[in-house]
């Protein structure tokens, strides 16, 4: 599990390789990740948007931005949490994801809550020792 906290917003991520949706012979690898966002702060916040940096096993970086997560812009009162699962296809058997959520307070102030960097690992990775 990977965890980061920004201004009382805790983001925990767990990833897994999805063999049944992957085809290694065609360089298609699919990963699922589950995110839990917890408001440990003292004020209500709303998740407005997301920004992901996805880096494949060759170091190629793709940036993804969008409104909300899984079609929602959840509002979190102090002590509340929101959990969702999504997925990421790669052309390599391993990679890395990291990013941030744009959060907004009731007063209209926006800030970036860090999504911790987490690895995308499959059993198809060939490691070489030098």
Curated annotation (Swiss-Prot):
InterPro entries, A to Z: ApaG_domain (IPR007474), ApaG_sf (IPR036767), Uncharacterised_ApaG (IPR023065)
Family annotation (Gene3D superfamilies): ApaG domain
GO biological processes: error-free translesion synthesis
The name this protein goes by in its record: Protein ApaG
Domain ApaG, first and last residues per copy: 3-127
């Amino acid at each position: 599990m990977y965890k980061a906290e920004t201004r009382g917003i805790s983001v925990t991520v767990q990833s897994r390789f999805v063999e049944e949706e992957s085809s290694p012979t065609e360089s298609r690898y699919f990963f699922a990740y589950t995110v839990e966002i917890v408001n440990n702060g003292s004020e209500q916040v709303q998740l407005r948007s997301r920004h992901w940096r996805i880096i494949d096993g060759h170091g190629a970086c793709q940036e993804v931005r969008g409104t909300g997560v899984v079609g929602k812009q959840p509002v979190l009162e102090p002590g509340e949490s929101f959990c969702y699962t999504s997925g990421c296809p790669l052309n390599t058997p391993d990679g890395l994801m990291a990013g941030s959520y744009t959060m907004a307070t009731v007063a209209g102030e926006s800030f970036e809550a860090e999504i911790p960097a987490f690895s995308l690992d499959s059993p198809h990775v060939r490691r070489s020792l030098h």
